[in-house]
Amino acid sequence: MPSPTKAAEAATKATATSDCSCSAASVEQRAPSNAANPSSSLATSGKIGGKTQDQTAAINKQKEFAVPNETSDSGFISGPQSSQIFSEEIVPDSEEQDKDQQESAPQKEQPVVLDSGIIDEEEDQEEQEKEEEHQDTTTATADSMRLKHSADTGIPQWTVESHLVSRGEQLNNLGQSSSTQITGRSKVQSSTASTANANPSGSGATSSAPPSSINIMNAWEQFYQQNDDGDTPLHLACISGSVDVVAALIRMAPHPCLLNIQNDVAQTPLHLAALTAQPNIMRILLLAGAEPTVRDRHGNTALHLSCIAGEKQCVRALTEKFGATEIHEAHRQYGHRSNDKAVSSLSYACLPADLEIRNYDGERCVHLAAEAGHIDILRILVSHGADINAREGKSGRTPLHIAIEGCNEDLANFLLDECEKLNLETATYAGLTAYQFACIMNKSRMQNILEKRGAETVTPPDSDYDSSDIEDLDDTKMYDRFGDPRYFVSYNGGNPMTVA
């Protein structure tokens, strides 16, 4: 009799086949009872006499599947088929979820970059042009200018070798819009034009003009920067006396106000040109629109400094009218940016306002020239309308008082002989005329000269004090006594603050 375990295993395998018929299922149910006796199965088939042979064959075939031998089971139905069933039930669901997630997630488009190679060619061309420009600028002559603090970085050779007029041709005139004087800039323009012609459609590449080493539109920003002392290259050029460099720097200035930049001691390029006795540079600066009334830290203008130094050419450069040739040259050189009003006013008025400017000591140009004994300077100033009777700001002395104080007979004779507007009776702030001042100073020779020229011989007062001055003197002594800090120190060892 078969064991119940094998019968149950056979029943389980039979239920896994879903495509079997109902008759086969009924035979499978009878299989456990007939498995022990094969003859009984034949009897059973004999009982089913009404069935056809095909049905009988199907029943026998079903028996073979229902009751297999122990060695006939390959595990195909129990193992792989069952795993395939589970995989068919689970895996499709996970795949469908992955597909849904992929469809719901947005797809990022990757940009497509098309390199035509034109940009690389332009960059190589720019590098080659920069190398050529660097070679052109580094081939400077032995007398090239070198400025302080590396202020000449990038200065091309044309700036150093430029002149006001060279063989009748104008150099570096910024007023000409079509000017292509910088070699590097012309090369860049030609290369840009060739690139545009080579690629007229402009498809796939963007062509732009590469910047030159020095942009002529903002070159003044580089050449008008101040160093640690506040000096610009124009200041340094005025000190060195290089007229050509000064003219080139002036042409770069878009406005005359750049010519009035002051250094740390409030000196403009015009001040430095006066201190170094550069009349030609002073004339060029004035024609270009430089302001002659700017003061330094002591209140001196360029004319004050020239009067102190006794430089006649510099004084003439600051006071004489401009000729027609100079005005025409100024308009030709600097007319593109110079203030026409400034040029016209300088050419028809001889700077009378500058002649009467006082410095911070209250002295005018005539006082400074008289103190230094520069008769020629005084002659120039008087010929241009300077006030010879002007009083200085401290004590009210005139140039005649200064000549008497210094016992300068030559200066006194010049004032008395050549200055028609000289007033001998002009008094100081103390009310002393020139003759009275000579009496107080015990200048007998000067008194005789003044008497011969018609000065009033009024003696000065014997004393400047009256009865009230004695009381004032007593008050002064009282103040000197109690105002002395040592007085309070001796008073119980105190000090002025504790006693007060």
Swiss-Prot record:
Subcellular location: Cytoplasm
Compositionally biased intervals (Acidic residues): 118-130
Subunit structure: Phosphorylated isoform A binds to dorsal (dl); inhibits dl translocation to the nucleus and therefore from binding to DNA. In vitro, interacts with IKKbeta. Interacts with cactin and kappa-B-Ras.
UniProt modified residues of type Phosphothreonine: 183, 293, 319
Bias-annotated ranges (Polar residues): 69-86, 171-189
Molecular function GO labels: NF-kappaB binding; protein sequestering activity
Segments traversing the membrane: none
ANK repeats: 229-261, 265-294, 298-327, 361-390, 395-424
Biased composition (Low complexity): 1-43, 190-212
Family label: Belongs to the NF-kappa-B inhibitor family.
Tagged with keyword Cell membrane: no
Gene Ontology biological process terms from the UniProt entry: antimicrobial humoral response; dorsal appendage formation; dorsal/ventral axis specification; dorsal/ventral pattern formation; negative regulation of antifungal peptide production; negative regulation of canonical NF-kappaB signal transduction; negative regulation of hemocyte differentiation; negative regulation of Toll signaling pathway
Keyword annotations of the record: ANK repeat, Cytoplasm, Developmental protein, Phosphoprotein, Repeat
PANTHER family membership: NF-KAPPA-B INHIBITOR ALPHA, NF-KAPPA-B INHIBITOR CACTUS
Keyword Repeat: yes
Region annotated Disordered, chain positions: 1-148, 171-212
Tissue specificity field: Expressed in ovary (at protein level).
Protein name: NF-kappa-B inhibitor cactus
Modified residues (Phosphoserine): 45, 144, 395
Species the sequence originates in: Drosophila melanogaster
Post-translational modification: Activated IKKbeta phosphorylates cact.
Function summary: Involved in the formation of the dorsoventral pattern. It inhibits nuclear translocation of the dorsal morphogen in the dorsal region of the embryo. Acts as a negative regulator of the NF-kappa-B (rel) signaling pathway. Cact is degraded by IKKbeta, this is essential for NF-kappa-B (rel) activation.
GO cellular component, one term: cytoplasm
